């Protein structure tokens, strides 16, 4: 990792921590982080999860050793902040643009999902539609999401 990356990554992690601190001090019911990057949560999954969800059907084995990525420090900080916050946390991103709403963040100690964390990956090119976020502070999860199809962009199959 070069100096530019290290500086940018430190700024990203500091910004995220400040955001969680502000949300905690202000009594926020939830927090939503919106970014372009897909931080590749799958790279941090326990081997049993990789086998079950990603590789088993292909007859492949998960890697014996995991390679470090540029997102490792960010994801570790995201885990710590999410657990400490204890309320709904949503990470919205594009990048790979495969529409999904899931629970991809696992505890590094428990190796189980962190229940108050949700990822929303927006749909994108060539399938140009959008995702509606519904915010209701009275609901326990605060956020819900719905894919909205743009009729003019619908494909004739």
Region locations from a protein language model:
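His/acidic metal-ligating clusters that form di-metal
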Residues: 1-104
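Binuclear metal-dependent phosphoesterase catalytic core
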Residues: 97-157
């Amino acid at each position: 990792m070069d100096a530019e990356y290290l500086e940018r990554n430190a700024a990203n992690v500091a910004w995220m921590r400040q955001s969680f601190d502000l949300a905690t001090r202000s009594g926020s019911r939830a927090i939503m982080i919106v970014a372009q990057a897909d931080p590749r949560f799958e790279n941090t999954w326990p081997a049993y999860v990789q086998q079950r969800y990603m590789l088993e059907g292909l007859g492949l084995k998960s890697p014996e050793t995991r390679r470090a990525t540029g997102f490792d420090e960010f994801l570790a900080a995201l885990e710590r902040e999410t657990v400490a916050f204890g309320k709904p946390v949503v990470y919205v991103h594009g990048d790979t643009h495969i529409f999904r709403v899931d629970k991809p963040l696992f505890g590094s100690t428990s190796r189980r999902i962190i229940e108050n964390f949700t990822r929303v990956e927006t749909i994108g090119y060539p399938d140009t539609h959008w995702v509606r976020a519904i915010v209701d502070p009275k609901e326990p999860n605060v956020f819900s999401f719905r894919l909205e199809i743009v009729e003019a962009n619908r494909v004739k199959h």
